[in-house]
Amino acid sequence: MAFFSTVKARVFVLFFILLSNSVQAQKDQLVIPRDVRSAYEKGTRSPDGQPGANYWQNRAEYDIKAELIPAQRRLRGTQQIIYYNQSPDSLNRLVIRLYQDILKKGNLRDWPVNESDLHNGMVIERLLINGQSFDLSAGNETVTRSGTNLTIKLNQPISPGNQAIVEMDWYFTISRTSNIRMGAYDSTTFFIAYWYPQIAVYDDVNGWDTYNYSGIQEYYNDFNDFQVEITVPKNFMVWATGDLQNVSDVLAPEYVQRYQTGQISDTVLKVISEDDLARGGTTLYKDKLTWIYQAHNVPDFAFGSSDHYLWDMVSLVVDERAPRRVIINAVYNPQSADFYGVADISRKVLEFFSTRMPGVPYPYPVMTVFNGSGGMEFPMIVNNGSQSSFAGTVGLTAHEIAHTYFPFYMGINERKYAWMDEGWAVMLPWEFQSSMVENNDRLATTIVEFNFSSGKEMDLPLLTPSIVYSSHVHYPGYRFNSYTKAAVAYQILRELLGEDLFRQALHEFMRRWNGKHPLPWDFFFTFDAVAGENLSWFWNSWFIEPGYPDLGIGQVKQKSGKSEIEIIRHGNMVIPVQLRVVFDDDSEEIIKKSARVWQNSVERIIVPVKHKKKIKRLELGHIHIPDINRQNNTVTF
């Protein structure tokens, strides 16, 4: 795409490294697990970081008609899925995710729930595949329902290049108190996610993704098209993934005009105000209204609905070359004081992401921030709770919108590699957060959090599959690895490569893999290619091996006009060196060295300092550099 930097990558021939299955003999080699290695052998992945010549992925088209029944807290739906098998394999079964079975009585989950929210799971009233009806009652050997997966053995396999048509009628009860990323927030406010029966991912590494949805782990979806009709009672509005297709069929004419004006407005416009709610008549006078949304090439669909939410709208040109303008909505409870500024914050953060970091124009036509609870991302819409501080509102808004790029634009498998999206969502908005809130150094705060947990028992290597943390007991480890540790790793990589080369590599990774399913090794090899060097020593240190960062000052040899200062790497994680030399007149010199000095397993370096004055104090490190033990970082003479 035009907005990406042009990169002429110097690609190393690394086949012998990439396809190695033995324990590494040298620190500059990466080991690839057997199941992942097979993808490179089959040519679906390439050792230069590109999608392979034989790369493929499946997709689907969803046509969903759903009705929200607030009085019953029920969502009822009928849907048709056209599933396209673009793999080289004949598929003799289909795996369908029934996310709402997480609240099914007797099912395992790693998220605490209120017993009153437990139910019979997703109730499926009809299932047809290519016109064949399937009996879901117990004892049918062609159907297996386990955890949150429904697996159907097919009489006629789906051959390569062919498709299957899946038709279903279903309903479920919406949770009231155990709101795992969705639910009822009051009697007439709902956020609906993880809701429709969804065909699981079948990929080139593991075949069917059969991990159950247990609460902690989030996304791994194919890129699909959605046509969704959502029927709600009169006075209810619906905000969702995608473009609203029939605004004139649901809003009263006055509000249609406001909606259309807001689509091109550079200042925040109130589509629905408190006075409007008090007066009534914001929607057309019908007992039921059907809101129609379309979304193309996205990994999921979610929506929110309420009859008493305020609605602010503004827009932004995210790509001057197109030019392309994005609609930004904030919809919220009138009691949520912080949300009155969210539309403006969202516009500013979209501008930052589009032009600064990552510097890739926001890829979708809409962004809606819905005032529900917690903080959870979905394509083109996020579900955010109210925050007690402006810094909290800025941080949550920026973080959830950052997920647009990772995992949605990039198709990340969060179930296995949550650090490939959460870490970026922490790191990308740091500068924005600092610019919006005085004395809000989020990088420094993250380093403090990192230093507290790094090297402890729950600190596992980043490449540990996220599903390993599938227990609420293990959530602190999941949180540290996926968010804090990954964000710091990306920042150290940024410092190592320098700003320009880091951006080139990030842009190239995004250009190559947007709309696909990159693995960690695709990320590693792309950065190797763009950097023009084998960075395995860095990947091993930060992503593969257990460990922690700890630098200390060793021996100091002082001579006339020159001193030699020994810096010792006590920990095995590589970090940059920053040495502050304070002289007896309180003047100072700052010496910086890249983490590259620790390449080739170097454990100590000598930093020479030329000086005419007497050294009074040496201080190693910085608030932006992780180091779990600062006690060995200072020497006073």
PLM features per residue range, with description:
Residues 201-203, 217-398, 427:
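Hydrophobic helix-coil surface modules that form long, contiguous segments used
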Residues 84, 112-188, 276-286, 290, ...:
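A surface-exposed beta-strand-loop module
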Residues 28-97:
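Early extracytoplasmic/domain-onset interaction patches
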Residues 239-240, 304, 556-621:
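Beta-strand-rich binding/interaction modules
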Residues 106-117, 171-226, 247, 624-637:
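Glycine/proline-rich low-complexity spacer/linker segments in large multi-domain proteins
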Residues 79-81, 96-100, 154, 162-176, ...:
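Short, hydrophobic/aromatic-enriched beta-strand segments in well-ordered soluble domains
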Residues 25-47, 58-60, 293, 327-568:
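Hydrophobic alpha-helical and helix-loop surface patches within well-folded domains
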Residues 91-136, 193, 231-236, 582-592:
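Solvent-exposed beta-hairpin/edge-strand motifs
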